[in-house]
Amino acid sequence: RLKKINPKLIYLSISGFGQNGPMSYKPAMDPVLQAFTGFMSENKGPDDIPHRTPVIIFDMTTALYATQLISTSLYARINEKFGRKIEISLMEAAAAMQSIRLMSGYMEGPYTHASSPSGTFKTKDGWIQIIVVKNHEFIKFCNAVGWKKFINDKRFVSNAKRRKHEAILSREVQKLFFKEKTDYWKNLLDNFEVQNEKVQNYKEFIESE
């Protein structure tokens, strides 16, 4: 009916699970898609419980994809005499956003850290996130925290071996980080060019320099 009024109309329709198929009738918002698409299973904490992120990540991702589709349709309409109907679902957007991890997870199984030590560690007054990937980065980390004895430790001489002994290494890092405040570790690691960052809330992020 709208097409008859304006043949060049671009119409966008967003659904939870698509316009067709066995789940097309179901209502769905972001938390439901976080559960359905495997995102929560990939977002487990040390307690091994799947966690939902309170950020409505798939709502926002769907909006971004929709904006791109509308933009390309508007561009195409310059040389066309007709508009189009665009259909997109939260499920499709969630799958597209996770495509790399989705395929590797399907082929290789549950997620394991790509590097070690890596993760979020509790400090004396907060939390800090670190990531150490390459061997020279591990050496920098050891020099920064005074772990010279671990540089040539056979358990930690390569990333593959560090991953194999991740539980031991992470436990040692946690024991160490709990001794000092976050800013102490941040400044120390920054001086040695080790990737790290304080876990901030929104207020801290907005007010950061």
Which ranges hold each PLM region?
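Beta-rich nucleic-acid/ligand-interaction surfaces
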Residues: A94, H165, E204-S208
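General beta-strand structural signal in soluble alpha/beta enzymes
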Residues: S13, K198-V199
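Aromatic-enriched alpha-helical interface/lid elements that frame and gate functional surfaces
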Residues: P117-N196, K203
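Active-site-adjacent capping/gating segments
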Residues: E108, A114, Y202-E209
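Short, well-ordered beta-to-alpha junction loops that form the rim of enzyme active sites
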Residues: M91-A93, V133, V199
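Hydrophobic residues in alpha-helical segments
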Residues: L74-I78, F177, I206
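Active-site-adjacent "lid/gating" segments in soluble enzymes
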Residues: K3-I128
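Short Asp/Glu-rich motifs
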Residues: G21, K161, E207-E209
